[in-house]
Amino acid sequence: MTAPTPIIFLVDDEAAILKMVGLRLRAAGFVVAEFAAPAEFLAKYNPAVPGCLVLDMEMEVLTGLDVQEQLAALGSDLPIIFYSGRADVPMCVQAMKGGAVDFLTKSACHEDLVLAIHKALEYDRKARQKRLERDFIRARIASLTPRERMVLAHVATGKLNKQIAAALGTAEKTVKVHRGRVMAKMGVVSVAELMQLAAKCGSTFPTVD
């Protein structure tokens, strides 16, 4: 299946700059969606669409930082490149603390923006890949029975069947059967692989109480 084409979301309330930057980015080979009003972008934003956001810092109704804050409240991790008419250090620091991937002045050369966009798109690609892997692991965990999840939690800590049996108050041979099913459903053959899945899955991976 062909991956969807990333979109460069360009938000700037100055029409002339919006048009000029949009034309330059299209000439560089990007697919661009232009928004003169940040509220319009927020209303139409679809987190399923890959890409990045090139965002004017100083807008009248909603500032770039306001947009960044609202996206964060939505749980979005869309990469943001801020660009501003002036190099304001406090604003730049606040933007970067909020997770922006870059901060450029509007006087910066076009090549700098293109490079920043490529960096942001690579960041977005990797983040989406990690989410897909995490969702796949969670789907595997969801296929386990409650007892298998308990065994999984113990196996992931490196415990032997005998130790797991004692902890769960069951026979060692029963644990062996459950362990085999767990490994098969999780698609792994070793504890090391299981621990790698746990690291990718994060806090939703079953743990021993």
State where each predicted segment sits:
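Active-site beta3 strand of CheY-like receiver
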Residues: 48-55
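Recognition helix of helix-turn-helix DNA-binding domains
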Residues: 160-193
